[in-house]
C-alpha cells in the first residue's frame, strides 16, 4: 500500500473512502466539516445520527457511487477526556480492517482533522499512518489453498487543504517507514525455523547492507569459539546449523569516531531448551526466540526506508547506530552442553550451566562483551525474549526494562510509550545475585524460581563494563502473541522496533548524578 499526499481544496479530494474521527457526545458535523464540504450528502445522511462516537466504533456512510468521495468511515474516539494515542491507533486499525472487508481500493485521511486531535500534530499523523499499515499485515508465503491473497488497498492519501506541511509529511513518512520495519521483523519472527536460520539472518543483513549502504560484519561458529566466547559456544554445540555473530552498522558521515548507540539482540532461531528439553506443547512457538534480533533488523529497515547510509541523517538519524546479533539454535545432541558443565565467557568469568534452557543470557553475555570491546558504546541496550517469568509478572502487553541509571530507564519508558511500546522498570538489586552464586564457578546461569526476570538481568549485568550505560529489555510478553489484536493479526508483533527507532532518533540524555 503506497502513501500519497493530496493538496488542494476539499472539493478536489478523491478516494474510495475517507476516514473521519469523532468524539463521543460532540457534534459530528462540526468535527467533520471539511468532509461535509467535499461530500455534502454526509450532512443529511440518516446514518450519521446513529453514530455515537464510542471508542472503537466504526460506521460506513454511503453517498452516490459516481462522486469523488462516495463513502465515509466514521471512527469513534470515545470521550475526549479519555483520549490517548492508543485510542487513535485502534480506531484507525478498525477502520482499515473495514476497508479490507469492503475491498475499498483507495483511502483518504484529512490531515487537519488529525492535527486537531489532542496531543502533538506530528505524533498524531505518524501514529495514524503506522496504524493504517499494521493491521493489514499478512504472512502467507506457504499458503497454497487460498485462491487470492487478502485484499489490501492500493494507496492511502493524506489530504492537505493548503500547501503540504513538511513537518506533517515527514511524520507520515516516519510512520510508513516504521511499518516497513515492523513488517520485516514480523516476517523474520513468524518464519519457520527451517527457513529462518542463523545463516539466513546473515543473508538478510547483507541484503539490507547492499540496499541501504550499511556495513555488516559476521563471525562463524569456528571464529566465535576461537575468539574465546565459551558461553556462546556452549549454546550452539548441539546444533547442526552454523551459528553467527552479526553486526550491522549505520554511521552518518563525519560520525565515524563517535561513540555509538549499540543494540544487542538475542537471535535464537529455535529453542528446544537443549538437554534441559522444553515440554512439547507449544514448542513450535520457539521460532520466535529471535525476537530481539528481529527487532534490530526492523530498526535498520526503518533507517533504510528513511534514506539509508546516504540520506537518513537528513531525516533525523544523526547518530551512529550498531546492531549486534548473536544467532544460533539451541538443540539437544551428543555434543550438546550438559547441565553442570562449566564454561569460560569472553570476559574471563566462568559460568556453571545449571539449565541449558537459560541459553539467551549465555549468548548475550559474550555478545555484549564483544560489542563493548569492539565499539566502546556510549549506551548499550540489549533486548531479548529472555524469561517466561517476565510474561507471568507483566503479561503480554508490557516488557520489563532494567537500567544502570534513571535517565536511561525513563527514556526507554517515555520514548517507548510515545509509540505504544509499554515498559515497566524492575530493580537491579545486587541482593538477588545471591541466587546466582556457584560453588564451582564465578556464577550459575540460573537461580531459583523466584525473581527469575531480575536474576536474568543481574546475570547480564556482570558482563557490563564499570561505568557503562546499559539497559536490558525483556520483551518475552509482547513480542509474540497467539491471539489477534487490533494492530496485529497473529504471531509476531514487531514490538520494540519503534522503541529502538525513537532511541536512534532522539538519543538518551545524560544521567543526572544518580
Swiss-Prot record:
Residues annotated for Mn(2+) 1 binding in this entry: 271, 357, 359
Listed EC numbers: 3.4.11.1, 3.4.11.10
Positions annotated to bind Mn(2+) 2: 266, 271, 289, 359
Cofactor: Mn(2+)
InterPro entries: Leucine_aapep/pepB, Macro_dom-like, Peptidase_M17_C, Peptidase_M17_leu_NH2_pept, Peptidase_M17_N
Gene3D superfamilies: Leucine Aminopeptidase, subunit E, domain 1, Zn peptidases
Cofactor, how bound (note): Binds 2 manganese ions per subunit.
GO biological processes: proteolysis
Principal localisation: cytoplasm
Location of the protein in the cell: Cytoplasm
Catalysed reactions, as listed in the record: Release of an N-terminal amino acid, Xaa-|-Yaa-, in which Xaa is preferably Leu, but may be other amino acids including Pro although not Arg or Lys, and Yaa may be Pro. Amino acid amides and methyl esters are also readily hydrolyzed, but rates on arylamides are exceedingly low; Release of an N-terminal amino acid, preferentially leucine, but not glutamic or aspartic acids
Origin superkingdom: Bacteria
Keyword field: Aminopeptidase, Cytoplasm, Hydrolase, Manganese, Metal-binding, Protease
One term of GO molecular function: manganese ion binding
Cellular component per GO, a single term: cytoplasm
Residues annotated as catalytic: 278, 361
A Pfam family reported for this protein in Swiss-Prot or TrEMBL: Peptidase_M17
Similarity field: Belongs to the peptidase M17 family.
Role of this protein: Presumably involved in the processing and regular turnover of intracellular proteins. Catalyzes the removal of unsubstituted N-terminal amino acids from various peptides.
The name this protein goes by in its record: Probable cytosol aminopeptidase
Organism the protein comes from: Oleidesulfovibrio alaskensis (strain ATCC BAA-1058 / DSM 17464 / G20)
Lineage: Bacteria, Pseudomonadati, Thermodesulfobacteriota, Desulfovibrionia, Desulfovibrionales
Amino acid at each position: 500500500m503506497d502513501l500519497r499526499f493530496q493538496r488542494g481544496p476539499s472539493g478536489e479530494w478523491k478516494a474510495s473512502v475517507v476516514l473521519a474521527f469523532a468524539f463521543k457526545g460532540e457534534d459530528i458535523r462540526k468535527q467533520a466539516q471539511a468532509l461535509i464540504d467535499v461530500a455534502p450528502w454526509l450532512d443529511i445522511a440518516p446514518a450519521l445520527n446513529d453514530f455515537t462516537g464510542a471508542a472503537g466504533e466504526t460506521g460506513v456512510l454511503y453517498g452516490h457511487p459516481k462522486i469523488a468521495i462516495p463513502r465515509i468511515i466514521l471512527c469513534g474516539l470515545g470521550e475526549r477526556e479519555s483520549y490517548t494515542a492508543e485510542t487513535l491507533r485502534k480506531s484507525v486499525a478498525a477502520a482499515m480492517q473495514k476497508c479490507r472487508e469492503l475491498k475499498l481500493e483507495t483511502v483518504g485521511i484529512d490531515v487537519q482533522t488529525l492535527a486537531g486531535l489532542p496531543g502533538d500534530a506530528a505524533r498524531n499523523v505518524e501514529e495514524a499512518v503506522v496504524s493504517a499499515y499494521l493491521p493489514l499485515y499478512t504472512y502467507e508465503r506457504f499458503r497454497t489453498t487460498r485462491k487470492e491473497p487478502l485484499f489490501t488497498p492500493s494507496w492511502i492519501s493524506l489530504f492537505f487543504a493548503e500547501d503540504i506541511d513538511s513537518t506533517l509529511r515527514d511524520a507520515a513518512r516516519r510512520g510508513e517507514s516504521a511499518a516497513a520495519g515492523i513488517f520485516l521483523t514480523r516476517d523474520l519472527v513468524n518464519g519457520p525455523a527451517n527457513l529462518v536460520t542463523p545463516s539466513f539472518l546473515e543473508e538478510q543483513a547483507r541484503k539490507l547492507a547492499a540496499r541501504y549502504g550499511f556495513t555488516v560484519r559476521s563471525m562463524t561458529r569456528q571464529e566465535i569459539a576461537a575468539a574465546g566466547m565459551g558461553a556462546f559456544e556452549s549454546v550452539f554445540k548441539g546444533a547442526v546449523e552454523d551459528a553467527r555473530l552479526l553486526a550491522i552498522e549505520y554511521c552518518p558521515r563525519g560520525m565515524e569516531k563517535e561513540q555509538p548507540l549499540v543494540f544487542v539482540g538475542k537471535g535464537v532461531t529455535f529453542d528446544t531448551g537443549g538437554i534441559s528439553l522444553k515440554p512439547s506443547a507449544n514448542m513450535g512457538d520457539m521460532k520466535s526466540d529471535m525476537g530481539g534480533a528481529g527487532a534490530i533488523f526492523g530498526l535498520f529497515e526503518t533507517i533504510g526506508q528513511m534514506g539509508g547510509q546516504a540520506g537518513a541523517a537528513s531525516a533525523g538519524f544523526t547518530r551512529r547506530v550498531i546492531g549486534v546479533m548473536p544467532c544460533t539454535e539451541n538443540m539437544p545432541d551428543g555434543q550438546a552442553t550438559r547441565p553442570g558443565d562449566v564454561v569460560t565467557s569472553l570476559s574471563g568469568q566462568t559460568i556453571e550451566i545449571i539449565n541449558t534452557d537459560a541459553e539467551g543470557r549465555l549468548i548475550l553475555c559474550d555478545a555484549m562483551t564483544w560489542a563493548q570491546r569492539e565499539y566502546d558504546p556510549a549506551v548499550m541496550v540489549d533486548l531479548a525474549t529472555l524469561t517466561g517469568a517476565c510474561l507471568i509478572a507483566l503479561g503480554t502487553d508490557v516488557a520489563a526494562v532494567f537500567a544502570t541509571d534513571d535517565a536511561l530507564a525513563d527514556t526507554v519508558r517515555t520514548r517507548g510509550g510515545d509509540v505504544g511500546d509499554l515498559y515497566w522498570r524492575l530493580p537491579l538489586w545486587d541482593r538477588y545475585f545471591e541466587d546466582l552464586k556457584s560453588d564451582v564457578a564465578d556464577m550459575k546461569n540460573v537461580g531459583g524460581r523466584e525473581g527469575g526476570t531480575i536474576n536474568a538481568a543481574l546475570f547480564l549485568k556482570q558482563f557490563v563494563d564499570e561505568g557503562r550505560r546499559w539497559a536490558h529489555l525483556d520483551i518475552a510478553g509482547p513480542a509474540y502473541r497467539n491471539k489477534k489484536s487490533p494492530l496485529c493479526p497473529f504471531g509476531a508483533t514487531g514490538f520494540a522496533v519503534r522503541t529502538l527507532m525513537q532511541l536512534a532518533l532522539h538519543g538518551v540524555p545524560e544521567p543526572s548524578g544518580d
